[in-house]
Structures are given as structure tokens and as C-alpha cells.
Design a protein with these regions (language model features):
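Conserved alpha/beta-domain cores
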Residues: 1-182
Length: 182
């Protein structure tokens, strides 16, 4: 991520409330939608699997003093408060940590935004290229229990079904998982 992208992702990560997170996600949505449209266009109708946000959140946060100070200013929060957030997000064992499907369980608005981007991108490309008949394939990462998958799949399907119903197109999509048990 560069420039405005990393700034919006960092804003999403350090948000304290769902409302703050949704503001950041609204900035990320058009970026992801555009990226997914580009992928669908490049693949010219071939299957595409989109893996949802997976890395531990601390990997997106700044590590040097200048960037930490700048993020605190951009977010209008105290430097010590931001350092505390960064410290709290660092994970000793990231495979067992707060990432992948567990992130979508804690913050379903992230999965909602990613689903919106995936489905809107596929609908837009299908409109331009109806012969491609794109069927998005969504991968929920780092699933270790069926209950995790059920929860996140419900979030994904509710958003996808609503967007498809509101469109002029009948489009299929698939939701799968990467099962990872350390």
C-alpha cells in the first residue's frame, strides 16, 4: 500500500468505533473496487479467487517515529495513545492471532466492504463484457472452526445477495475458505 491507500488502511486499524472504521472503509472501498475490476479485466472471464484481508494488523502500522507522529496528527489522536494502540496490536504468534476470519468476526464491516468491492467490481465488468459471465470466488482465510466460517459467510452472503438483487444482473458467486490450523 502506498500514499492514500496505506493512510486509509491505518485509519481503519486505529479506529476505536465501528463508525470511525466505516469512514475509513468508505475511503478504501473505491480503491479495492477499482483493483478488483482491473483483475477481472486482466483475467478476461477466467476464474478469480479474492482472498479477504488476512495479515496481522500490526504489519500495516508504521514503525518509525516520523510515520507514527504523522499518523497521530492525521488521526487527531495523541502520540502516546497511538503508540499504545500499535503496541497492543503487535502479536507474539500471528498464526493464532487476530487476523483472517477472526478479524472479520470482530469487525464485520471490513468483510462487508470487501464483499461490496468484489461484487460491485464483478457486476461492472459483467456489464461491459456480458459474455465473460464472471462468478466471483471469495476466500475467507485462516478458518479453524466451522462456526467461524458460518458467521463470516453469512455476512458475505447478506451483502452480496443484496447488491446482486439491486442490480440488473443475475450473477452467481462462491464463498470458500482456506482452512488453517496451526
Amino acid at each position: 500500500f502506498e500514499g492514500d491507500r496505506i493512510k486509509a488502511v491505518r485509519e481503519m486499524i486505529v479506529s476505536k468505533t465501528a463508525a470511525q472504521r466505516r469512514v475509513a472503509l468508505e475511503k478504501i472501498l473505491p480503491m479495492q473496487r477499482s483493483d478488483f475490476e482491473g483483475i477481472y479485466e486482466a483475467m478476461e472471464g477466467l476464474p478469480v479467487t479474492i482472498r479477504y484481508l488476512d495479515p496481522p494488523l500490526h504489519e500495516f502500522l508504521p514503525t518509525n517515529s516520523y510515520d507514527i507522529t504523522q499518523l497521530a496528527k492525521d488521526m487527531h489522536i495523541g502520540l502516546d495513545e497511538l503508540k499504545s494502540v500499535i503496541s497492543s496490536l503487535h502479536e507474539f504468534n500471528p498464526m493464532m492471532g487476530h487476523r483472517g476470519c477472526r478479524l472479520a468476526i470482530s469487525y464485520p464491516e471490513i468483510a462487508e466492504m470487501q464483499t461490496t468491492a468484489v461484487i460491485q467490481a464483478a457486476l461492472a465488468v459483467n456489464e461491459r463484457h456480458p459474455d465473460w459471465k464472471i462468478e466471483p470466488e471469495i476466500m475467507i482465510p485462516l478458518v479453524g472452526d466451522v462456526a467461524e466460517l458460518r458467521y463470516v459467510k453469512k455476512v458475505v452472503c447478506e451483502v452480496a445477495d443484496k447488491l446482486i438483487q439491486e442490480s440488473e444482473f443475475d450473477m452467481k458467486y462462491h464463498v470458500g475458505t482456506m482452512i488453517e490450523i496451526p
